[in-house]
């Protein structure tokens, strides 16, 4: 049995993910889905899982905690970000939006995104929980009127009453990540079966020699 856990990006996606995982469950692969905000203690107790699916800060923390484990990144793409920016514009009508996330490769497309959502955009790097708090504070200081971000920053904004739009991951992106994890789990299961067969053959050989 190979154990797989997915950290749901948001609580409202737990139901959808649960339905999807029930369809994929097999005798060889066992799925679980959970959601936690911030840096919960549970991250230190995942040794019994063979494959983990996570995004953002949680993903980076898990890579540091479990360097030898199979960890699938659940990342949003440009379409997800643009959808959130347009939703932010419709909801809050801001002239300045702080885009708070780990922004590899985003600088090049920032002018285009700014034009599409008709607002000034500024990037704020978020790598961990402390930098998430720092990013929200920097947005206040810089006069940003709203924020577009992932889960940790969104929760901070909700606590502080700062206008914020959460970047939702499309179902297709979720399904691709889960399929990738399922394929990895199948490979792990196959390798374990091979190892068990070899071990059995060696044990039988030893018994034959002793006889």
Predicted features and spans:
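Helix-enriched interaction subdomains in cytosolic or periplasmic regions
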Residues: 42-76
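Short, low-complexity N-terminal regulatory "tails/caps" that precede and couple sensory modules
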Residues: 51, 101, 142-148, 153-193
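Sensory modules in modular signal-transduction proteins
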Residues: 191-211
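Structural motif
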Residues: 6-12, 33-37, 54-57, 75-78, ...
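Short hydrophobic/aromatic-enriched beta-strand-loop microsegments
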Residues: 29-31, 69-77, 118-125, 163-173
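A short, well-structured beta->alpha microelement
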Residues: 26-47, 77-86, 119-140
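N-terminal basic/disordered segments at the start of proteins
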Residues: 2-22
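Short, charged, surface-exposed secondary-structure boundary motifs
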Residues: 16, 80-88, 109, 131-136, ...
């Amino acid at each position: 049995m190979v154990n797989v856990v997915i950290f749901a990006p948001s609580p409202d996606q737990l139901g959808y993910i649960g339905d999807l995982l029930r369809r994929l469950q097999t005798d060889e692969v066992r799925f679980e889905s959970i959601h936690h905000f911030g840096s919960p203690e549970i991250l230190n107790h995942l040794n019994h899982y063979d494959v983990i699916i996570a995004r953002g800060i949680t993903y980076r923390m898990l890579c540091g905690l479990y360097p030898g484990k199979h960890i699938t990144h659940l990342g949003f793409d440009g379409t997800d970000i643009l959808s959130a920016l347009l939703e932010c514009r419709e909801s809050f009508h801001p002239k300045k939006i702080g885009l708070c996330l780990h922004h590899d490769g985003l600088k090049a497309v920032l002018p285009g995104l700014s034009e599409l959502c008709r607002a000034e955009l500024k990037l704020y790097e978020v790598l961990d929980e402390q930098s998430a708090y720092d990013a929200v504070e920097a947005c206040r200081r810089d006069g940003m009127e709203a924020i577009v971000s992932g889960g940790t920053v969104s929760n901070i904004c909700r606590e502080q009453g700062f206008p914020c739009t959460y970047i939702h991951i499309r179902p297709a992106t979720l399904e691709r990540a889960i399929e990738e994890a399922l394929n990895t789990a199948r490979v792990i299961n196959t390798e374990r079966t091979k190892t068990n067969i070899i071990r059995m053959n060696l044990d039988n050989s030893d018994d034959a020699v002793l006889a």
